[in-house]
């Protein structure tokens, strides 16, 4: 198990990573997400031993690295996969994967598993971006690392290839049976691939939980907004035992709620675009469409309620409503929504 305790990294007088704590089980995949400059890559560099830590410790198996006792990268048995592939251009696929490898049977295993058997003699220049990343992954796993760090491995690939390759990488990591930390800026990638997701903000891990919990029960408004389109709807919530169903009341309907941070009384309800319906054909109206964004399979609308709250609603692409149209919006979800204390 990879264990990280109160890990902090300073660059001069600036703290870049602040008191990071996490444990990663065997074959578990942790996705790290956050805005640019939040400390994601710094964490990977610290875990790999490429930079020293300022406070705390990390350990795996028979080694422990601290601020006073630094364990170098070669003593950690860590595998790294980079966004730019980091392949040797003058070597073939086979030679890249076998580089400094004693047991070539492991190279054969991963070349076959990752669909590279017919490209053994090819140089990287002849490969597509997806094939290059498969070679990089095969090279990493063939060395039987104790844990794997992936730094935005799909960021240089097109959207269609990303969607398929993310599952190939996940499947390979699971078959290798090693813990992995995967840095990404893509929230959808994080939610779909990770066993758990960690959301970083200014060097602080704001939430570490299952993908479902990070999306539906975010620990903060920052997490709520970062993990997807988020609107906050004025509501009231009775936090006493008398409210058995944990019902939250709003101007556009009642829904079950999950109170966070001691929310009670006047509250803000976290609403995702798919929690709502929008109809411009009814005689009753309660909002005005401000703008619409076509997304292919759907359309995203921003609507202003008569009460003053702005919401975002996602509906079928076939349902086209023009801006400035009067419409009727209502809550349609049946699952509990996150409830935050009212923001003054």
Give names to the regions the model predicted.
Residues 12, 41, 230, 240-344:
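Non-catalytic connector elements of ABC transporters
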Residues 33-35:
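The feature captures the beta-strand-to-loop junction immediately N-terminal to the Walker
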Residues 57-76:
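ABC ATPase NBD Q-loop/coupling interface
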Residues 31, 70-72, 76-86, 181:
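ABC nucleotide-binding domain signature
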